[in-house]
Amino acid sequence: MKLGAVILVAGVGIPDEEMEKFLEMKRPTIFEQMIVSYQRAGVADIALVTRDGMADKIEQTLHRRGVTFLDIESDSFELAVLKGLSYLSDTCERIFVGDIRFPFFQPDILVMMQKRQAELLGAVYGGMFGDLICTSQACARNICKKLEQQIEESAEMAEGTVRSIGVAAFWK
């Protein structure tokens, strides 16, 4: 079974100043620790979703780690998840989605999660859902369809709102 992981850097609400602090940390970086945890659990394909060209800065510390960088233009959570899941859903049977704000977890947690046959599984700590999920390939594809639909509806609503107040709009 091929495992994949999406690490969200974009769309998680981290201000640029805080992200700079992440990037300035001494070795091993938080990014490296998170990637090693995924790899120890057997994850073969890791996609790091970044924004605004941030991949170049992060890539300097992660070269030769087997990570794919996916860059998005906005800081949209939905777009970040969509980009990562779309990239991995054709090749991976189980996909983890994690958030860079919560980089520390034990690899055995990932092993336990991937062995469960649930379509969508969230890690729970202290009775509350954490920011790590595991999804099946089929569920990932369904999530992508729903996110694409949400994003499209959002754009249509924004366009309708702009037109209703009489402002001419230019859409790329």
Short names for language-model regions:
Residues 1-18:
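N-terminal nucleotide-binding beta1-loop-alpha1 segment
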Residues 3, 30-94:
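Conserved N-terminal catalytic core of the sugar/cofactor nucleotidyltransferase
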Residues 7-9, 49-50, 99:
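Short beta-strand/turn micro-motifs composed of small residues
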Residues 17-18, 57-59, 106-109:
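Short glycine-/acidic-enriched loop or helix-start segments at secondary-structure transitions
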Residues 19-24:
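Short glycine-enriched, charge-decorated loop/helix-capping segments at active-site entrances
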Residues 27:
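Donor nucleotide-sugar binding loop of glycosyltransferases
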Residues 69-141:
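Conserved beta-loop-beta/alpha segment of the NTase-like Rossmann-fold superfamily
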Residues 125-172:
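Catalytic-core segments of class I nucleotidyltransferases/pyrophosphorylases
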